[in-house]
Amino acid sequence: MDNQLKQFAQSSQLAGGNASYVEDLYEQYLVSPDSVDPKWKTYFDGFKGREAGDIPHSAVISHIADAAKDALKAGTGNGAGDERERNVGRLITAYRSRGHLDARLDPLGLAAPVNTPDLGLPFHSLSDADLNSEFSTGGVGGQPRMKLRDLLARLKATYTGSIGAEFMHISEVEQRQWIYKKLEAAGGNYQLDADTQRRTLERLTAAEGLERYLHTKYVGQKRFSLEGGDSLIPMMDTIIRNAGKDGVKDVVIGMAHRGRLNVLVNTLGKNPRKLFDEFEGKFEHDEHASAGDVKYHMGFSADVATDGGPVHLALAFNPSHLEIADPVVAGSVRSRQERRKDTARKQVMPILIHGDAAFSGQGVVMELFQMSQARGFAVGGTVHIVVNNQVGFTTSNPLDTRSTRYATDVAKMIAAPVLHVNGDDPEAVVFAAQLAFEFRQKFAKDVVIDLMCYRRWGHNEADEPAITQPLMYQVIRKHPTTREMYAEQLEKAGVIAAGAGKAMVDAYREKLDAGEVTTELAKVEKTPPSSPLFVDWPKLLEGKLSDPVSTKVEKNKLVELAKLINTIPDEVQLHSRVAKVYDDRRKMAAGEIPGDWGFAENLAYATLLDEGHALRLVGQDVGRGTFTHRHAILHDQKTDNYYMPLRQLVDSPEKATVIDSLLSEEAVMAYEYGFSTTDPNTLCIWEGQFGDFANGAQVVIDQFIAAGEAKWGRISGLTLLLPHGYEGQGPEHSSARLERFLQLCALENMLVVVPSTPAQAFHMLRRQQHLTTRKPLVVMSPKSLLRHKLAVSSLDELANGEFQHLIGDANADAKKVKRVVLCSGKVYYDLLEDQTKRGQDDVAIIRVEQLYPFPRALLAAELKKYGKATDVVWTQEEPQNQGAWYQIRHHLQFCLADGQNLHYAGRARSASPAAGHMADHVREQQQLVADALVNPFNDTFAE
């Protein structure tokens, strides 16, 4: 039997684990049963698939092992003729699988040829003598039988022309069949009508015309030219016009610097006069953007006209950190879909434009692919366009840029189809664009277009590329432009009159000279305030952090909501530990015991949902909570179903979203930032598993959260919950790097808080949505305080309180106090417990709950109460060079009353955030508490 199985594997090309080969045979059988080996035909006949319609491919794979013996015993076939039919079937499969390797993709003709013997006749035991014989086509060309000569020509035209398609790695049979039927129906002849051909030429003229205009008028200025990749503009035009016809209302575009100015003018319809002003140093910054940004980072939005009606286009703002804008775009798209109640995800679509080097090199690309079908992040598929100019700045050798054949191979991790297309064949480009859009709409899945092109100039216009790519640029300098070649082609075909191409060039230049918009814009009425799509951005932009807000909730309403979200249906069987948590929460709701952190946090969400706000809480393990405190998602121990108490308060599940994210910080945080910038009515929260891991998304924090408003005028209310505190868990589980966030603070760009009680957390979360503006909120959230016996709050504190920037010492007698200790967060309880043990009454402990904007006036007034206190001590758990000390010392100094001196008590300087051994942690903690409360000051140490 072992020999039989080995023979079976070899004869059926299963060797090497190529299980997809069996699926290909089955598809071939469905189209033409006689074209497969009789053994396989007998086996496939058992599925009754042709009579009943196609079946899931898994049914084939799951039976292969069991069927091997029976398949070998099946019919013996009908001789050499049948064998040749089978060989032709294998040839067809080879072209579908590997034809892209022979495709004419490189406009420069520099790509090294690939050895593809399996695309030749001899590999499949066929020869020139068979060329005039007819064989079953397997559906190629729409004919059941064809001469091998004609069939081979059709396969070459389809799979080795200007489009190289990779799709046989897709596991879903329906998707593979859909793609090869589309490709084979065209057969390499993309059949654009004359109007589309003329429009394609006009768009190429626009792409080239803008670059040449800028090149001659603003010599040497950076613009990151699209030249060489001009076909991007007709590609975008095709996708957007098809989107309009298919009912798409919004398209959100993300792209880096290459070609961005061209897309702004020729796709989104930015007035070229405004672009020229920017080249001349006359910027029209959003008045809310205090710093501004370079012109090739700026976003834009417009409504463009299509045959299907207006389509709103939004080009996302973009830093120079390549690909990081991708998840920001995806988050914005998801938000727009939810606002439109677009559950099918057909009305809002993302287009992401990448560079080849960044697409294969930046890890955030992989992270976003992994999110693309996850239920909390899916957007119905993204159209990816890789502007593949075959060079990354100065690096062009694939041996240096990647370890895969194609820059796009990372997309195969989610079985996305890839269409490689020669950028010098505009009609193939248009066909690929239309095919990609249709695939996205039909299958709600990502699709990649690899636009093979070149870069006519250097990385920027002041760069000399021949230094590092001498041979490539010898070819490029002699190479005609895509527009020139296509205009000549259309003139020869009689599609345009002689000289019409030149007339288009002149007409476009006249538009630029006149400062006229170069694409068709649509007039769209403003969204009325009564519309669910309306967002009052001007009001939020005018709001200030200092505007008074109330976070109080009527106590009766609070109790009602607390009872509602803590009453679990009888049919939901909770884990015993969770059942105990909810038993306690019901007691908290009744006022029998004070509320803990989890109770107050969930109740804050409930009050906001009840008021009409939405909630989106995302992060690793957020449903339960890393420290088992939240339990916002309950898992039935009998059925494994889940129950979300907060969803009792909303009419749509998406209004109360709690998502356990994939194990990514960078892409997920960026996604939530994008969501928050589009929907200010949702409390968007990203929680770190531990705050220490937030720096995995440092680029998001630096480029977007901290600076997005200053650079681009984009406001965000994203909340970061970052578990922070020193409990002896070592250097990777202690610090959210508070010092880094404080360093980023300026001009009221965000809030940084360290809440120490459940009531503070309750009012902090409510305040975030009740502010008259939107600012990122960075929270050093607790770990051990989640169950600390002293970290509790009453219902009255929740109902009637407010967020306190500063909490004074209610027990201190100002007349006795000689030393005032200032601190933030969990260390307060360490100080309080030690003070109580010592029986000290000459020390007051003040908690600074908001570190930015710093409450100077409040602290100065509080310190003034302690006229006999000569020493004020800032105490922190973090090492001296970390934490808040160096970032707030100037504020503390300012707040001192006459006769008061400032001191430091905390850990010594350290390159690592925390000690790795519990014994060291305990010793250091005891030392800093004693230094704060009783020990003499070491001011030399504090410098």
Explain the meaning of each model-derived region:
Residues 4-51:
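Subset of Sec-pathway N-terminal targeting signals
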Residues 5, 47-232, 248:
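Extended, charge-enriched "interface" segments that sit outside catalytic cores
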Residues 83-93, 100-134, 150-153, 174, ...:
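Flexible, glycine-rich loop/tail regions that form catalytic "lids" or insertion modules at the edges
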Residues 189-210, 281-330, 334-341, 755, ...:
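Active-site cores of enzymes that catalyze phosphoryl transfer or operate on phosphate-rich substrates
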Residues 213-273, 586, 595-614:
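Active-site pocket-lining segments that scaffold enzyme catalytic pockets across diverse folds
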Residues 225-236, 317-329, 361, 425-429, ...:
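Phosphate/oxyanion-binding active-site loops and adjacent basic polyanion-contact surfaces
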Residues 249-415, 419, 627-679:
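Cofactor-binding active-site loop characterized by glycine-rich and histidine/acidic residues
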Residues 394-404, 412-448, 452-458, 466:
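Conserved phosphate-handling catalytic cores of large alpha/beta enzymes
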